[in-house]
Design a protein with these regions (language model features):
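A short, glycine/Asx- and small/polar-enriched loop/turn
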Residues: 19-21, 139-144
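Short secondary-structure junctions
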Residues: 54-55, 126-129
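Cytosolic beta-strand hydrophobic patch enriched in CBS
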Residues: 58, 133-137
């Protein structure tokens, strides 16, 4: 989505003009989940925010779409493992008491295949050796990049991958840090249905 940096003295009107929208998200540049993340839909909401370090935040266009994540293992630019999931709700809905969960997509579905191609395109541009967590929105059939992290997913997703596919993304990420030549053995087989 369109986005801009936050700094002292920035007004709602400034953000509205730059993003060309009245609905936007304020979130930390370096964060996880929906911690310290705010959906702003009015000037009053923006003015009521109490952000002590504005330079650590950004504003981005609010997208009303379905949120997905693709978790991957890549070695020397080659994807060894990738799995797509739909979030039950966008992560910010957790603040409203909604339970956030991930629903694994059927690998053969058209959407899963489209997300896999998109993930390949993004990761090909990045290259290297990583565990990644890519988040995208899908709105009216379009895939919209939200963010990517060079780390395993949060929440209960590491155990989910371990239980369902026998892949421990946290362990793999740690091994990548310790041994630049480490190549995990990945069978990518479904072990258990939940």
């Amino acid at each position: 989505p369109k986005h801009c940096s936050i700094y002292s003295g920035l007004s709602y009107a400034d953000i509205e003009k730059y993003l060309r929208c009245t609905d936007f998200i304020i979130k930390p540049i370096s964060g996880h989940g929906a911690r310290n993340t705010y959906h702003i839909a009015s000037e009053r909401q923006f003015n009521d925010l109490d952000i002590s370090n504005p330079h650590e935040y950004e504003a981005e266009e609010y997208i009303d779409g379905e949120l997905y994540h693709i978790d991957s293992v890549m070695v020397n630019g080659v994807i060894l493992y990738s799995q797509s999931f739909e979030y039950s709700y966008p992560c910010i809905e957790y603040k409203k008491g909604k339970v956030i969960s991930s629903i694994e997509l059927d690998d053969t579905s058209a959407l899963s295949e489209a997300l896999s191609r998109y993930n390949l395109e993004i990761l090909s541009a990045i290259g290297g050796t990583h565990v990644t967590h890519l988040e995208v929105f899908v709105k009216d059939g379009d895939i919209i990049f939200l963010e990517i992290a060079g780390r395993p997913p949060g929440g209960g997703l590491v155990p989910l991958h371990r239980i369902t596919h026998g892949i421990d993304l946290a362990n793999i990420a740690m091994r990548f840090q310790m041994d630049p030549y480490y190549v995990p053995s990945i069978a990518n087989q479904r072990l258990k249905y939940g």
